[in-house]
Design a protein with these regions (language model features):
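Short, non-transmembrane alpha-helical segments in secretory-pathway proteins
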Residues: 64-101
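A cross-family detector of function-defining hotspots
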Residues: 99-109
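Short, compact, well-ordered microdomains
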Residues: 109-153
């Protein structure tokens, strides 16, 4: 029953997004369908030891954070990644899922070899304006700490 619900939900989302102006203008991208196994610090947090020196990593739909997990654990993996971050001076962060966007091709997708990125609004004390991070829950690549954040201890 749960599986049917997720399939119907995914169809609705994919149908709605495929007709958007942004999707029509940019077309479907691809991230190469990597499948790197992630390590857990604890049940709610990934181990993330690498710092990105690319200012676009996570901040653009062309260079999303790839946490993997798909329909079964993708949303949880997104939170596991975000739980591994702190502000640049050790501030705790807060995050809110804004929704999905930006269709792309992936062999790890649910239907028709496609997936959507999730957008999270992330904030911490001292940050002038909240930032939006783009996360891919279908493909899994080496996780990195985006510019402006630090590894949670």
């Amino acid at each position: 029953m749960k599986t049917r619900f997720f399939i119907v939900l995914a169809l609705i989302i994919l149908t709605g997004c495929s007709s958007s102006k942004q999707s029509a203008k940019k077309g479907w991208g691809t991230y190469g369908s990597p499948n790197v196994e992630q390590k857990l610090l604890n049940n709610e947090t990934f181990v993330v030891d690498v710092y990105s020196d690319d200012a676009t990593y996570g901040y653009t739909q062309e260079n999303p954070i790839m946490v993997g997990g798909g329909v079964l654990s993708g949303a949880r993996n997104e939170r596991r990644f975000l739980n591994a971050l702190m502000g640049p001076d050790g501030e705790p962060i807060t995050y809110t899922r804004l929704g999905s966007c930006c269709g792309f091709k992936t062999k790890n997708g649910l239907l028709d070899d496609g997936g959507l990125l999730d957008m999270y609004q992330v904030a911490h004390k001292g940050l002038e304006k909240e930032v939006i991070l783009y996360i891919n829950m279908y493909d899994s690549d080496t996780l990195k700490i985006p510019v402006g954040f630090k590894k949670k201890k």
